[in-house]
Regions:
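Active-site-proximal alpha-helix that buttresses catalytic centers in soluble enzyme cores
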Residues: 4, 9-75
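Phosphate-handling substructures
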Residues: 72-131
Length: 131
């Protein structure tokens, strides 16, 4: 069986990342710093042979992938697929709120005493989205 390598790159820094806001399905654009960082990642992957590329359907993921592919010598020939099934978590009513508020609310609404207890326990995506 042939060896397969999977490379996972997180999207570049966004406006909400800068503002410490919860961002799952809500979408904010990459900052200049985020775009610059992804260009550097792309430069670092120039010698890597890719068969295909995938991203979620969020604008920040699509922009990230376009930047990565623009830095690759074969980028125009690498098949690129946008797939909503790999979209980030939806944080429900917490979307767009402050990160600190989310981390204060999640343990309580999921019936944990502390944030540490929450992280020590498996919580499903559905439980978080419905919190």
């Amino acid at each position: 069986m042939a060896e397969t390598n999977l490379y996972i790159v997180r999207h570049g820094k966004t406006m909400f990342n800068t503002l410490a806001r919860v961002q799952g399905w809500c979408d904010t654009p990459l900052t200049q710093s985020g775009r610059d960082g992804i260009h550097y990642v792309g430069l670092g992957l120039q010698d890597t042979k890719f068969e295909e590329a995938y991203s979620s359907d969020s604008g920040r993921a699509i922009e990230t992938m376009r930047i990565l592919l623009s830095e690759h010598p074969d980028g125009k020939d690498i098949p690129y697929h946008v797939d909503p099934r790999i979209r980030e978590w939806c944080f429900g009513s917490l979307e767009g709120g402050f990160d600190a508020e989310m981390w204060g609310v999640l343990p309580r609404v999921l019936n944990f005493k502390t944030e540490d207890e929450l992280f020590a326990t498996e919580v499903t995506f559905e439980e978080i989205a419905n919190a």
